[in-house]
Every structure is written in structure tokens, then in C-alpha cells.
From Swiss-Prot:
The encoding gene: COA3
Keyword Transmembrane helix: yes
Stretches of the chain found on the membrane's Mitochondrial matrix side: 1-31
A Gene Ontology cellular-component term: mitochondrial inner membrane
BP GO annotations: mitochondrial cytochrome c oxidase assembly
Stated name of the protein: Cytochrome c oxidase assembly factor 3, mitochondrial
Function: Required for assembly of cytochrome c oxidase (complex IV).
Organism: Debaryomyces hansenii (strain ATCC 36239 / CBS 767 / BCRC 21394 / JCM 1990 / NBRC 0083 / IGC 2968) (Yeast)
Keywords: Membrane, Mitochondrion, Mitochondrion inner membrane, Transmembrane, Transmembrane helix
Length: 90
């Protein structure tokens, strides 16, 4: 009994030597190109908008209203020494 269909190893949508798309595949995909590009634009614009909004809000943030606690010079020297020791040991 003969099996109908394409020959084994044959793909009519890809060139078997270069694996490039054939004109048949390009014709099949053509009606979906515009909708796919609109979907891609929507899918990328939402996260991009959230990112840009976040960067904009963070750049406007001011820390001038937060008081910096006073620190004595000897405490500052002690903290710097601890920081340097930790940095050198790592």
C-alpha cells in the first residue's frame, strides 16, 4: 500500500540546502505580518512605558527633606576603618 504525502526528507517551506524560507512560506506568512507587528509593539510598549515612568518618578525624588544625623569624627573614622577592613578581607 502506497503512502500519500510528501517524500521523506522533503520540506516545501524550507530550501533543503540553505534552509531559507521559500516563496511559498513567505506567501503563507504574509497575512499575519501586520497583526504580529502590532502585537509585538503592544507587548513591548507596556513594559517600556512602566520602565520609563519609574525612571522618571525616581529622577524627581528628592532626599533633601531627610535629615542626616550628625556623626562625630571619631565615629566616622571607626566606620571608615570597619568598611576598609571588610573591603580588604573580601
Amino acid at each position: 500500500m502506497a503512502v500519500l504525502g510528501k517524500p521523506k526528507g522533503h520540506n516545501r517551506y524550507r530550501d533543503p540546502r540553505t534552509f531559507e524560507m521559500t516563496p511559498a512560506l513567505l506567501r503563507v506568512r504574509a497575512p499575519f505580518f501586520a497583526r504580529n507587528m502590532i502585537g509585538l509593539a503592544l507587548a513591548t510598549s507596556i513594559p517600556l512605558g512602566v520602565y520609563l515612568y519609574t525612571v522618571d518618578m525616581l529622577s524627581k525624588d528628592e532626599f533633601s527633606d531627610i535629615p542626616i544625623p550628625p556623626i562625630a569624627d571619631d565615629e566616622l573614622a571607626k566606620l571608615k576603618k570597619e568598611y576598609e577592613d571588610k573591603k580588604n578581607s573580601s
